[in-house]
Each structure stands twice: as C-alpha cells, then as structure tokens.
C-alpha cells in the first residue's frame, strides 16, 4: 500500500525550490539530502524518482530542492505531486499504543455504550496533538482527540476503536 509522506504545495522563489506539505511523522528521516522519493503527478502520468538536493524548514512546511529541478517553471510543473512510500518498507512499531496513520484509517469508531460513531477517514497531526477525523453515517465529520482519556482501546484485529467521548464531543447541531 502506498502512503503519502508529502505533497508539493507550490514553487518557492525562482531557483526551483518547492514548498512541500509534510504528511509523515518522520520528516527528518524522509526529507534529507540525498534521499530518493517516489513522486506521483496530480493529473496522472508516470511516477518518477526525485533526489533531494537540499531541504530546510519554512513554518510548518519544508522548502525542498530536487536534483534536476532548476527553475520556477520546472518547480511549478510539480505542483500537486505527492511523494509516496510503500507501507511494507516501514519498520514495525514496538509500542502497542502507537500506530501508523494508515492502520487507523478505515477503522470503525464506537462508544463505550456500543453506539457506532463512524469510520476514521484521516488522522490529523496538529500542534495540539493528533485528531481522528471520523466520517459518520450521514457523511458529517467529527474530530476526536487521539488521547487516552477519550480513546480507550484500538483493536486492529477487530477493526474497532472504542471511545468514551466527553459531553458535547459528538454533538453535531
């Protein structure tokens, strides 16, 4: 399974540098000089590999320069490109209370009383912590903080996440 670790938001400057939105919990390991990333263009087309020439932090994004991307036109052509890794290449997690995002996405979320909330559509990484974006049966989104006080258990085998939501968390009105 391919996992997205970053996406080109836009060109930065005139020398081929790109603004990349990070979508990995290990940007220091994935976005380093000399690393090779597999890129998929947004409008189809063939995937290709990109070698990182330089990288630096810019707010909550990275400014990345790739070998062979030497000007703004070349950088603009990459807008929307996503960078991928194969989930089979990820190291196993030793801690039973830690998960890769893709392991949580698609799991059914239920309350301690057994009521179904919905399915995890996405895991959001924010400055305040992780949030589970849960898509309900009526196609609304509920954000559930991924903290032990609310998320009581995660069963990958049963494909279930059990939560004990505080009053008001699931109120959608």
From Swiss-Prot:
Example GO BP: ribosomal small subunit biogenesis
GO molecular function: ribosome binding
Annotated compartments: Cytoplasm
GO cellular component, one term: cytoplasm
NCBIfam families given in the database record: 16S_RimM
Family statement drawn from the similarity comment of this UniProt entry: Belongs to the RimM family.
Record's function text: An accessory protein needed during the final step in the assembly of 30S ribosomal subunit, possibly for assembly of the head region. Essential for efficient processing of 16S rRNA. May be needed both before and after RbfA during the maturation of 16S rRNA. It has affinity for free ribosomal 30S subunits but not for 70S ribosomes.
Protein name from the UniProt record: Ribosome maturation factor RimM
């Amino acid at each position: 399974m391919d996992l997205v670790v970053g996406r080109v938001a836009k060109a930065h400057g005139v020398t081929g540098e790109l603004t990349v939105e990070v979508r990995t919990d290990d940007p220091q390991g994935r976005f380093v000089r000399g690393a090779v990333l597999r890129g998929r263009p947004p409008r189809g087309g063939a995937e290709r590999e990109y070698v990182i020439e330089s990288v630096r932090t810019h707010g909550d994004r990275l400014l990345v320069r790739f070998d062979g991307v030497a000007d703004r036109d070349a950088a603009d052509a990459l807008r929307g490109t996503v960078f991928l890794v194969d989930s089979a290449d990820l190291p196993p997690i030793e801690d039973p209370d830690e998960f890769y995002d893709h392991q949580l996405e698609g799991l059914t979320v239920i309350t301690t009383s057994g009521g179904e909330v919905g399915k995890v559509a996405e895991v959001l990484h924010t400055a305040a912590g992780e949030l589970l974006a849960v898509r309900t049966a009526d196609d609304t989104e509920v954000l559930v903080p991924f903290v032990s006080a609310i998320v009581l258990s995660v069963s990958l085998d049963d494909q279930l996440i059990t939560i004990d939501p505080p009053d008001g968390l699931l109120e959608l009105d």
